UniProtKB/Swiss-Prot annotation:
It is found in: Cytoplasm. Pathway: Nucleotide-sugar biosynthesis; CMP-3-deoxy-D-manno-octulosonate biosynthesis; CMP-3-deoxy-D-manno-octulosonate from 3-deoxy-D-manno-octulosonate and CTP: step 1/1; Bacterial outer membrane biogenesis; lipopolysaccharide biosynthesis. This is 3-deoxy-manno-octulosonate cytidylyltransferase. The gene is kdsB. Belongs to the KdsB family. PANTHER family: 3-DEOXY-MANNO-OCTULOSONATE CYTIDYLYLTRANSFERASE, 3-DEOXY-MANNO-OCTULOSONATE CYTIDYLYLTRANSFERASE, MITOCHONDRIAL. Its EC number is 2.7.7.38. Its main location: cytoplasm.
Length: 246
């Protein structure tokens, strides 16, 4: 298998504020978390784990021969859960890169994960995250995060507002992060910052502390499931692609 020095970690906490037991919600006959895992597993990376506090989630993943790491339900964020899981990986001294994939993207493309890894390994950024070019109409129809970048693609700021103001094309931020090991260790040691708390975006803690985030372009905006309405959209999308035999 490729990229033996990379760990993919999918944090999946059973409790959810906006959608009850979100990872266990069905899309077709398969749970959300199983769909995410199966998509990511197509990248064919040996060190792929689901980090969870739930026996139910663990059983689902183990039935499809996935690897599970148990983490405390009190862990506050997905990044913290990712780090706690990383510390429990056997022989983790051989892992130099960690990719955090949110457990709410049931149709995420495995190529996006591989692109993050390649970009991270061939750059000097502390962290790499994917973005998609979208028009104003697309981004206004959602509650998504946009990012402003410099000419080299280095992230300057992330916001829940449309940035840059007045533009007609934006960079939609996809919720995946590739960390160098030392960058992940540094991140979890830092306290939440003013901008992070104001925007409710963890990645601003990185920028406020002088660390760097590189962006890599991917083609498609993945469906994220956070609410009942999102779940309905995901089910509808699945039904449509099933009819097409995809």
């Amino acid at each position: 298998m490729q990229h033996q020095d990379v760990a993919i970690i999918i944090p999946s906490r059973l409790s959810s504020t906006r959608l009850k037991q979100k990872p266990l919600q069905l899309i077709g006959s398969i749970t959300l978390i199983e769909r995410v895992f199966k998509q990511i597993n197509q990248a064919n990376l040996e060190h792929t784990y689901v980090a969870t506090d739930s026996e139910e989630i663990s059983n689902i993943i183990k039935k499809v021969r996935g690897k599970v790491i148990f983490t405390d339900s009190a862990i506050p964020t997905g990044t913290d859960r990712t780090y706690e899981a990383f510390k429990l990986i056997p022989n983790n001294q051989n892992i130099n890169y960690i990719v955090n994939v949110q457990g709410d993207m049931p149709f995420i493309e495995p190529s996006s994960v591989l692109k993050i890894i390649e970009y991270l390994k061939n750059s000097e950024y502390d962290i790499v995250t994917p973005v998609v070019k979208v028009d104003r109409e697309s981004v206004e129809a959602s509650s998504n995060v946009t990012v402003a970048v410099d000419s080299a693609g280095k992230a300057l700021y992330f916001s829940r507002s449309l940035i840059p103001n007045g533009a007609e094309e934006f960079l939609y931020h996809v919720g995946m992060y590739g960390f160098r090991k030392n960058a992940l260790e540094k991140f979890v040691s830092l306290k939440p910052t003013f901008l992070e708390k104001t925007e409710r975006l963890e990645q601003l803690r990185v920028l406020e502390n002088g660390m760097t985030i590189g962006t890599c372009l991917v083609e498609n905006v993945p469906i994220s499931v956070d609410t009942e309405e999102d779940l309905k959209k995901a089910v509808k999308f699945y039904e449509n692609i099933s009819k097409l035999g995809l």
